A protein has these predicted regions:
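Eukaryotic helix-grip
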Residues: 1-351
């Protein structure tokens, strides 16, 4: 059984929103998404995918995906530049902490995969789907769904807006030298279009407060605003543009925060894999007969895949399953939107 700290983790079971608050949240998120979308369009159409290295310092790369951090205010001033005036760095929830210089992060480049698979891996509107996603992506420690605002539908299977709570591992946390950090935030996913018709997937995380979400004992409340855009630029190649800022609260030093933030942005490379594994699980349950017929055909090529699913007793389980290579190919090539529509309709595999 895989380690799962999501069960009974919800510290704020009383959070809900009125219809008026729901519409306000939708408007708020739409504004953030449009602001960020303009940045992506500018990066593609005006900057021609070129990063201004006077402003941005390279931190880390993974294959063709590159992570940068904005240079310190002192360095920018020496080059005659001002800090980025981005919503991510100016509209975080106030935490009454003294002003501090937080690193703005940037992720640009490409990675392998199909955008629909990626978006199926990203969208996680329920607790069970969050647990499955975390088992593949390893992007958080514990989490809870506080209140759904917009749920995926058959017409828009990748669109969601959910109020959530999560904890994440921070540097030195395992040593007990620093306290656990938690976040209350809105998470939004969906599809937009460039003026030329190109589909662009988006993923937004932005901190938010409610009267019911007061800070918890033995935890430090952090704030974050992070967005990502994904676009298919050729077969099996996804363009990525992501940026954001995380304030972990307390006194974590910049030199410790930057590597952790870089790793978090690089975890986006796991979204496609997550989507593919969810498709295989979906086909295994929905089309078992097709797999059984295929197994009757002798095939020396076999694959062993570790699949995550929710058992009848609510436990998250990872199990090694043997497939013939042809079945794996059939599953990974199936339409992720079909699986996402099933997820939107509340199919048992993705409650």
């Amino acid at each position: 059984m895989v380690k799962d700290r999501f069960i009974n983790a919800n510290p704020y079971p009383d959070v809900n929103v009125s219809e008026e608050e729901r519409l306000q949240l939708i408007d708020l998120v739409d504004g953030f998404v449009q602001d960020y979308f303009q940045k992506y369009e500018k990066f593609v159409l005006v900057d021609k995918h070129q990063v201004d290295e006077r402003r941005w310092e390279h931190v880390k790369s993974k294959d063709n995906l590159h992570i940068y951090t904005e240079r310190s205010q002192k360095e920018l001033a020496s080059k005659g530049l001002q800090p980025e005036n981005a919503p991510s760095s100016t509209e975080l929830v106030d935490d009454d902490s003294p002003e501090k210089e937080l690193p703005v992060m940037l992720s640009v480049g490409t990675f392998v995969g199909e955008m629909d698979d990626l978006m199926f891996g990203v969208v996680n509107p329920t607790l069970d789907v969050m647990r499955i996603k975390a088992s593949y992506v390893h992007d958080l420690d514990s989490a809870a769904v506080l209140c759904p605002v917009v749920e995926p539908s058959e017409e828009e299977p990748f669109r969601s807006l959910v109020v959530k709570w999560m904890t994440i591992d921070v540097p030195l946390q395992s040593t007990n030298l620093v306290k656990c950090r938690d976040f209350v935030y809105i998470e939004a996913t969906g599809i937009l279009h460039f003026t030329n018709g190109d589909r662009v997937g988006y993923h937004l995380l932005h901190s938010i407060n409610f009267p019911q979400t007061k800070p918890l004992p033995n935890r430090i409340r952090g704030n974050l605003s992070v967005f990502g855009f994904f676009r298919q630029i050729e077969e099996n190649v996804i363009d990525n543009f992501a940026s954001g800022i995380v304030d972990p609260g307390g006194d974590i030093m910049r030199f410790l925060l930057i590597p952790a933030a870089a790793e978090a942005l690089l975890s986006a490379t796991n979204y496609v894999y997550c989507g593919q594994m969810k498709k295989i699980s979906w086909m295994l349950q929905r089309r078992r007969s097709a797999f059984e017929r295929q197994e009757q055909v002798k095939n020396s090529d076999e694959c062993i895949i570790r699949i995550s699913f929710i058992a009848l007793d609510g436990q998250l389980i990872q199990r090694k399953v043997t497939f013939c290579a042809k079945c794996v190919g059939m599953a990974t090539k199936c339409d992720a939107q079909d699986a996402a529509r099933d997820q939107a309709e509340g199919y048992a595999a993705y409650k």
